[in-house]
């Protein structure tokens, strides 16, 4: 949004824009920046196609998918999808942490202000993070009359969402969401932690172009990593990026512009609690699992 256009808004909406808009922080991202599993990619590709053909839909009284709910553990790409989509298509992105606004004591007014701002700005994404903080199934948080009033208010705001805007929400607690809240979304995406089949592709995605990446891990190491990851609940794309950056830093500190697959794997294994010599630990694990050709 240009400064000139911003100045034309009422002061309270200018303040809302400055507080919730994160558009400048996502510059340079695009839909190639995010790694998606095949299932989610199909869903997201359809979401993108509808968005790209939205003007054609409008002519026939149709609306593109514009309410998206993402489930999944932290670090699996829920927030990053909103950032990449907004940056790729040049949309304003307003991020609302529902846990924070609840504690502010003025939650509905804040939400209403963001939705009103989006109506003025148009072509924007409202991203509701930690939506489980208010949209819990009856019998939990919703016993609180203030929370019930807030969720009912949010329903009305979502139902009146301008067709040019998109509302995206994210939660780690799929099972606890209010069913009426879930039904208001056109698209539901289930994000999983990356399985091993995606680890190598993910590593390469995060490598700086000035670094050379040497794939030197043998099949035993790869097998051990695959088996280990199956039972590790903390793995995320964000962690993989951290491991790649750590390997790049080590290379720089040692006067190199290259690092190996094994180096990154070592960080992965250490983060999962491997304290022995890597190969000894891997060998022991493979033996315990009955793997052959160690």
Identify the meaning behind each predicted range.
Residues 1-33, 196-294:
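C-terminal alpha-helical "lid" subdomain
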Residues 36:
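Post-transcriptional modification and biogenesis factors for structured RNAs
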Residues 39-45, 49-222:
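Walker A/P-loop NTP-binding motif of AAA+ ATPase domains
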